[in-house]
Amino acid sequence: MANLPGDSIQIAREYMDSLLVESRIIGAVRPTSRFEFLGESFDTPIMTAALSHIDLVGMAEGAVKAGAAVSIGMGDNDTLGEVINTGAKVMKIIKPYENHDEIYSRIKFAEENGAIAVGMDVEHSIHAGDPEPDNIHGLQMKLPSMDELREIIGSTKLPFFIKGALSVQDAERCAELGCRGIILSHHNGLMRYAVPPVRLLPKIREAVGDKLILIADGGMESGFDAFKALAIGADAVTVGRPLMAALKENGADGVRDKIKEMTDQLLAMMYRTSSADIRHIDPSVIWEK
């Protein structure tokens, strides 16, 4: 999809690069990147994205070394168990399977084996190029109705996140349904001409206040990007492609080093803007070109 008209990855990148940061260095104190999430404490608000079809165990091992939370995508229950056994604090994102037994069995396994949250990437229910339901590895997807989502969310004691909520309307519906949070994502450009997740952050934060945890996904290539997202409404960010490249090049240590590099970049921006911690970044430091 790259270089095609309406490439959402390119649109998101261009928007991110249009955001500028105002320096406020006089009187600044050395900041901390500590991140409190679902009763757990982490060294960074930079999380792994809900990736699939890679070495998820290696990714988790690297995240643990960097003090980061982990989200994972497709993979069987055995793989989820192996990831949790690394010591990672894991959010399991589940596909919108047409057969709801597939959903409930994965939720149950996540509950019983120590995941800290579960969720669903609802945006993966519709095929990228036509209005037909998606099919992944022979398993049919289907967009759940509001009532079905309410039942799914209510079936678990774990905090539930919707991945792919990318509008004020969807965010408000997630709050109504009892979600703990949303992951703002265009799913690697699945939808053409998508509004960049970061561009929607301020409006969604204004609409839902503190009712939802907001996690920004898509196009997070540096700690500078993470800073911008945190400044305008995100509680955390997830990173995909840069960590996939680091994992391929140097395994778990590569993931650790990349997360630490991005966290250092984040801390540098926080220091230069008098942001003592991630909860106290003044959104007015962000300017648009």
Stretches with model-predicted labels:
Residues M1-I9, L243, G251-K289:
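C-terminal extensions of enzymes
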Residues V29-F37, S71-V83, R106:
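Short, charged beta->alpha transition segments
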Residues E36-D76:
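Active-site cofactor/substrate anionic-group-binding motifs, chiefly glycine-
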Residues M1-F42, H280-I281:
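An N-cap/entry alpha-helix motif that binds or orients negatively charged groups
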Residues L51, G218-M220:
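Active-site metal-binding loops of divalent metal-dependent hydrolases
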Residues E61, K65, E98-A216, G223-A246, ...:
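Alpha/beta enzyme core
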Residues R13-S23, E111-G114, T156, V208, ...:
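Structural signal for hydrophobic packing residues in well-ordered secondary-structure cores
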Residues K65-D101:
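A gly/proline- and charged-residue-enriched helix-loop-helix capping module
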